[in-house]
């Protein structure tokens, strides 16, 4: 798994790095939002810039993001985590983003709604096991991405009350009281 981490607290970043490397994850650590965006853009460019017979062309953007996960602190120097997430999702809306923050959960949840994309939150402090479990839980993220697409389709077709209720029944199993929520 390839993970980009933006965390301004050196000790926390070091803890993440050691734990993720023990799991054999390829981890890139940055200490601020500006560096995080630079690394993300560089990796994205590597994916989209191809050279054939000394001719350079840009391939169409892939749905395949350059990192499996971008793990962001919410409050960071230069550019905050929310603005980093906005920029990344504008480049690749399929990128999985997880906020790891001690910021007030309700305020953070309200803030990330403006992204209009699926992002995850893991509330600090948390155990390394909780972090690893969140990172490895790809199935829930994939299902929620699918539901996000379904919601966009629902908006486009102007559904009946009965159709909305049917969709709510499908979504109900994902309504959990875990320490982190998906938006």
Q: Which residue stretches match the model-derived regions?
A:
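Conserved acidic carboxylate
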Residues: 7
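Acidic catalytic/metal-coordinating carboxylates
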Residues: 32, 80-84
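Active-site residues of response regulator receiver
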Residues: 73
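Receiver (REC) domain active-site loop signature in two-component systems and cognate sites
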Residues: 76
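Alpha4 helix (beta4-alpha4-beta5 surface) of REC/receiver domains from two-component response regulators
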Residues: 83, 90, 103-121, 128-133, ...
